A protein has these predicted regions:
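Interfacial transmembrane-helix boundary/kink motif in multi-pass membrane proteins
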Residues: 2-19, 46, 63-95, 259-284
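Membrane-interfacial loop-to-transmembrane-helix junctions in polytopic alpha-helical membrane proteins
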Residues: 6, 36-39, 122, 225-229
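Juxtamembrane helix-loop-helix connectors linking adjacent transmembrane helices
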Residues: 35-40, 67-138, 152, 289-294
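Alpha-helical transmembrane spans of integral membrane proteins, capturing the lipid-embedded, hydrophobic core
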Residues: 14-25, 45-53, 81-94, 128, ...
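Alpha-helical membrane-inserting segments
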Residues: 23-31, 54-59, 88-99, 103, ...
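Transmembrane helix-loop-helix hairpins at the membrane interface
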Residues: 124-293
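Alpha-helical transmembrane segments in multi-pass membrane proteins
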Residues: 21-61, 229-240
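Transmembrane helix-loop junctions in multipass membrane proteins, especially transporters and channels
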Residues: 29, 33-36, 60-68, 97, ...
Length: 294
């Protein structure tokens, strides 16, 4: 069996990710092309899809020989995994908020939270399209279906962590940095465990859709109602997540194979330093500093 050049693999994945990151940064300028909100959203959504899927398709051809696809497997106890996933992401979001809050209070960083507003049902539908449908589908196809899958030859743990870091830095927002990393880890685990991108898309869509619902309630009813719903649902996710994790640990004591991941590591070596990974990280950090720090 041919040994994998893992440095080349890393550089190839990070090069494609860097291209996506640069293309996405052009979106704010494209928004200036028209004042029509519907046309603007359609342009942004189209460019967003192209910016992620076109480089991914090119990457598939570039490193196609290194392909390793996880074996498809049924997701047992789906509600258990649902609460673990949403509980983890919710906990990470609160941690992220607590980390950023003192920095914002001290004036070190600007307001890093993205708070869209809607004034009609039409706006809600556009927000659903631009937040709860297109990003979950395109981002999961790219970050799990391409980045994570292509990194599997270096080992599950490294592949999950690196792909989650790429996913987190891609968003370029301090207000999302920690919880998008946690989400990337969760979605990555689910992808390798099930061998399917569909559960990842559904979880991602649920998370983003929940934010859309909170935004709509905040706009059409009151901030108090939105806050009450947010705290209630977050509490359910957190409690359900901890309870589900406890049940998972009990199941693992009886059956060590429950929830275990198959290993897809291949033989290979790092022949040089993955410089493109450093360039991607530097570009992403520069964007975060430029966007968030006052």
């Amino acid at each position: 069996m041919e040994r994998t050049d893992k440095t080349k693999l890393l550089n190839s994945v990070f090069l494609i990710s860097l291209i996506c990151c640069v293309m996405i940064r052009l979106l704010p300028y494209l928004a200036l092309l028209t004042e029509n909100p519907v046309l603007r959203e359609l342009i942004l959504c189209t460019v967003y899809i192209v910016s992620l899927l076109l480089p991914a398709a090119a990457g598939e051809r570039l490193i196609g020989s290194e392909a390793v696809s996880p074996e498809k497997k049924k997701l047992n106890a789906p509600f258990l995994w649902l609460f673990i996933a949403m509980g983890t992401v919710t906990a990470a979001a609160y941690i992220n908020y607590l980390v950023i809050l003192p920095l914002e209070a001290a004036g070190i960083v600007g307001n890093s939270q993205y708070n869209p507003s809607v004034s009609s049902v039409y706006d809600v539908l556009l927000l659903i399209l631009s937040s709860a449908i297109i990003p979950p589908v395109t981002e999961e196809l790219f970050f799990r279906g391409f980045v994570l899958k292509r990194l599997l030859p270096i080992g599950n743990r490294k592949a999950i962590i690196i792909s989650a870091a790429v996913f987190s830095l891609f968003h370029g927002n301090l207000g999302q940095l920690i919880y998008t990393f946690a989400a990337g880890v969760v979605f990555g685990y689910v992808y390798i465990y099930t061998g399917s991108i569909i559960p990842c898309i559904l979880l991602h869509g649920l998370n983003n859709g929940y934010s859309v619902i909170i935004t709509a309630i905040n706009s059409f009813f009151s901030p108090e109602a939105a806050g009450l719903l947010s705290i209630s649902v977050d509490s359910i996710f957190l409690f359900g997540g901890f309870l589900s994790l406890f049940i998972l640990l009990l199941k693992r004591r009886k059956d060590e194979s429950f929830g275990a991941l198959a290993e897809y590591r291949t033989d290979g070596e790092y022949k040089s330093f993955p410089i493109i990974a450093v360039i991607y990280g530097a570009f992403a950090v520069f964007q975060i500093v430029l966007t968030n720090f006052s």
